[in-house]
């Protein structure tokens, strides 16, 4: 399918969603990503190497923009604010480094901050490498080489996690009422915004898969094409990188074309899934 037709299809879906203003005319298989559960086990291999404490800031040194309030209707705005943080560097086997900023309003001491950073750093080491570290064959929205996750802010509040692909960072809100303790699937969701979205959304095979499936994997995936990618990636991992036979059948029945399109995309772009073995 040529690029013009692909763009036309994208515009058509966006227009229809804006006009409908509701989910009732859209089909989806799972109500939310949490219905998938965790796809990574505690003892699974990890590319995480070490966590280094760097320092604790003072005087409200850092400026950032919060996630939106966690509301069913997605209302509310992000707020820019100043904060202090315990700063850590997580190092992975490839040498990739992620800066962790643990807000002092959430972690009241360095021990709690380190425990939080270490927990998430280990989980991030278990997800596919191309989500964590990007790839020379992927690029972001300003056409620069995808660098994957470079910074994570662990903050206080029942807010929505959100990713900023320009800054290669995302927010983690452990107090978010809809997030499970393991959080591996939502980590992959946010990581996909930093590494995968831009190039995949211009892929003709992926666009055709959206048309052919006539189904979204979750209710939230209907929000936008970027959210469709981000929601789908964890289900692809469940199908191709784990032994969860029961749920595989349900996923493949719902979005077989997207799963196959991701297979091709990962292979064609030589994307590493380390430490997971996917196929």
Located regions from the model:
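Intrinsically disordered, low-structural-confidence terminal and linker regions
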Residues: 21-54
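Auxiliary, metal-adjacent structural segments of Zn-dependent hydrolase domains
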Residues: 50-168
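Second-shell loop/turn segments in exported
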Residues: 105-115, 173-178, 215-223, 247-249
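Sec-exported extracytoplasmic/periplasmic mature domains
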Residues: 129, 192-200, 235-242, 267
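Active-site recognition of the HExxH zinc-binding catalytic motif
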Residues: 184-199, 230
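Classical Sec-dependent N-terminal signal peptides that target proteins to the secretory pathway
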Residues: 1-20
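Short pre-active-site segment immediately N-terminal to the catalytic Zn-binding motif
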Residues: 171-187
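Metalloprotease/metallohydrolase-associated module, dominated by Zn2+-dependent proteases
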Residues: 209-279
């Amino acid at each position: 399918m040529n690029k013009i037709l692909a763009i036309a299809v994208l515009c058509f879906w966006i227009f229809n969603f804006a006009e409908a203003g509701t989910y009732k005319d859209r089909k989806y298989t799972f109500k939310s990503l949490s219905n998938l559960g965790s796809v990574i086990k505690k003892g699974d291999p990890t590319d995480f190497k070490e966590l280094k404490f760097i320092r604790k800031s003072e005087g409200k040194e850092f400026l950032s923009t919060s996630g939106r309030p966690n509301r069913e209707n997605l209302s509310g705005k992000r707020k820019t604010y100043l904060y202090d943080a315990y700063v850590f560097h997580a190092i992975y086997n490839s040498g990739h480094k992620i800066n962790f900023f643990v807000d002092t309003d959430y972690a009241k001491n360095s021990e709690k901050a380190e425990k939080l950073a270490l927990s998430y750093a280990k989980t991030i080491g278990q997800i596919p490498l191309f989500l964590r570290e990007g790839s020379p064959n992927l690029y972001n929205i300003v056409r620069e080489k995808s660098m994957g996750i470079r910074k994570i802010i662990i903050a206080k509040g029942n807010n929505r996690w959100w990713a900023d692909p320009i800054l290669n960072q995302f927010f983690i809100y452990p107090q978010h009422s809809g997030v499970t303790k393991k959080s591996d699937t939502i980590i992959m969701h946010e990581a996909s915004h930093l590494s995968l979205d831009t190039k995949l959304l211009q892929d003709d095979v992926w666009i055709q898969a959206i048309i052919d499936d006539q189904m979204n994997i979750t209710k939230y995936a209907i929000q936008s094409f970027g959210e469709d990618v981000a929601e789908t990636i964890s289900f692809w991992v469940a199908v191709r990188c784990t032994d969860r036979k029961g749920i595989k059948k349900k996923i493949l029945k719902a979005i077989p074309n997207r799963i196959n399109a991701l297979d091709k995309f990962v292979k064609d772009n030589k994307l590493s899934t380390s430490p997971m073995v996917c196929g």
